[in-house]
Amino acid sequence: SYINTASASDRFYDDNVWLGIDFCDIYEATGDKKYLAEAEMIWKFIESGTDDVLGGGIYWCEQQKHSKNTCSNAPGTVYALKLYAATGDERYLARGKALYAWTKEHLLDPEDGLYFDNIGLDGRIGRAKFAYNSGQMVQAGALLYKATGDESYLKDAQRTAAACYDRFFGEFTPQGGETFRIIDKGNVWFSAVMVRGLAEL
């Protein structure tokens, strides 16, 4: 995908993953196979962004293969599982499982259950934590549990969801009311994608 007001530049795998997920969702809502065809076409591009460096995973950018990011791999897992649900093709389920396992192994912070941003090809971890990255792993775990019945995926999702609640929500007290927790101020899109995962769970 490209910004429509700019000339062609670098192609980012994560941006195309979001488009693929959208096409899957439109297909689910309409049953129109042209949207499924678009989703499967985009998936071929995503697959071109994988290799055996660091044991697997999807790169962030086609022209700058310096890191493999949670923002490519977590929604990439969701994307694969949505394609599996739409087609019944076991290859998509296998890819979803593999991407999930790779992301968990390389980018999960075992201390709190949230996910780091990226891993460089030198093995260095980009330690920033964003709501959408962890939220997509919640959704991925929930979808894998639905597809397989394996409760380990459900437990993973529940742990990361609880960690999201601890990290990305804060207390709010309305005038004259009782205190409760709401999503912290920040990037609204990141928060919205996190909520997708919480809703799936």
Identify the function of each model-found stretch.
Residues 1-201:
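Glycan-recognition and catalytic cores of secretory/periplasmic carbohydrate-active enzymes
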